Each structure stands twice: as structure tokens, then as C-alpha cells.
Amino acid sequence: MKAVLLTLAVLFLTGSQARHFWQQDDPQSSWDRVKDFATVYVDAIKDSGRDYVAQFEASALGKQLNLKLLDNWDSLTSTFAKVREQLGPVTQEFWDNLEKETESLRQEMNKDLEEVKQKVQPYLDEFQKKWQEELQIYRQKVAPLGEELREGARQKVQELQDKLTPLAEEMRDRARSHVETLRQQLAPYSDDLRQRMAARFEMLKAGGGSLAEYHAKASEQLRALGEKAKPALEDLRQGLVPVLESLKVSILAAIDEASKKLNAQ
């Protein structure tokens, strides 16, 4: 159980960077990835939620109830934005500390990834070369058929389709063959990488003290994050109180109005 937190942290910090070995891009920091994902996700929820609220208020029932949900929604999004700004430096510090504490382990894993990449790169290059050759052959076979279609009449469309079908099937079968060959070539290296990662964690378990030290430091960082986040969360709670109270008053007023109309009938 002690290894769970460390495993998740290391996989998050190194695993999502592994793709940059294949793409040769500059990796984002862990905090940048979290921040970008959270921003996109929250903004999407905010925008779609506001659209639903606006649609409801524009409906006959929404106009009759007059709950002013859109005003409350804007207040909520403003409150959440403020809390997100307050938590930004706190979470940034947490990720910086966590990356610092796991730096040596991440370096070892990145070294393993680089070694495996160098071994499998020739197979990837060969696969790409064969794929380009297959595409060129397919284009050469299809080009005359396209010329026939341009010169022919509508009745030749079916004839053209009949000629294209076996070519497409041949292309599909050849592509599957190349993919299967690549899979078989890469399988040993994939197993080797898994074994290396497993060996790293076994060394940590055998070390005992190192694993306990990583766990203790990560737990300490989480506790510090919780303590520093308390003021922002309290601000969030205080900001929600008037919004919820306003919504409660609007609902009670709508119910009261509906009751009066029913009694009048």
C-alpha cells in the first residue's frame, strides 16, 4: 500500500512524458499538463452549463418561475474562478516539490525509456518506409481508374467501384501484415521495458528505507497542500452561501406564487 502513492506519482510524472521520446518534443511540466487539462475541462462545463441554464430561463416554465438562475450561475462561476486563482500558487508548489523529490527515480526511468527508444527506432523507420511504399503503389494502381472515371459516363461508376474494391482489400491486407510484423518486432522491447520498470520498484521495495522516505515526503506534501488550500476552500464556502440563499428565496417565492394562483382558482 505504501507504494501506491509513489507509483501513481512516478507514472504521472514520467509516463505522460514518455511520448515525447517518440515525438522528440519538449515535454510540458506536470503542473502545466494538469493546469491545461483542468482549465479546458472546467471551461467546457461552465460554458455548457450556462447554455442549459439560459435555455431553461428562456422557456415558458423558466419565465414563470423567474428563478434568476443565470445571475446565480454567473456568481458561481466567478466564485470558482477566484478560488482557482487562489489555489494556483499552492498546487504549483506541491507539484514542484513532488517533482524534486522523485527526480532521481524519474531520471533512471527516462534513461530506460531512451535506451528502448534507440533500439526500436529502426523498426519504426522501416515500418514508415514500407507504409509509404505501399501508399505509392496504391496511388499508381488507382490513378488509371480515376482517369477512366473522368472520361467515362455514369454507367462506368459501378465498373470503377468493382475495380477499386479488390485494390482496397489488397491494401488493407498488406497494411495488416506490416502492422503485425511491427508488433512482433516491438514485443520483446515492450516486455523488456516492463521488466525494467518492475525491477526499479522492486529495488525500492527491497530498500525499504528509500520507499518509506518517498512515501513520507509525498504524504507531507499532501498534508501541506491540504492546509494551504483551507483558506481558499473556506472562501468558496462563504461565496456559495449567498448564492444558495438567493436561489432558495427565489424557489420559495415561485412556490408561493403558484399556490396563490391555485387557491384563486
Swiss-Prot record:
Compartmental location: Secreted
Claim: Transferase is one of the keywords in the record: no
Domain of life: Eukaryota
Gene Ontology CC terms: chylomicron; extracellular vesicle; high-density lipoprotein particle; low-density lipoprotein particle; very-low-density lipoprotein particle
A GO biological-process term: cholesterol metabolic process
PTM remark: Glycosylated.
Region listing for 10 X approximate tandem repeats, in residue ranges: 67-265
Expression (tissue specificity): Major protein of plasma HDL, also found in chylomicrons.
Pfam families: Apolipoprotein (PF01442)
Modified sites of kind Methionine sulfoxide: M109
Transport is among the record's keywords: yes
Stated family: Belongs to the apolipoprotein A1/A4/E family.
Its job: Participates in the reverse transport of cholesterol from tissues to the liver for excretion by promoting cholesterol efflux from tissues and by acting as a cofactor for the lecithin cholesterol acyltransferase (LCAT). As part of the SPAP complex, activates spermatozoa motility.
Protein name: Apolipoprotein A-I
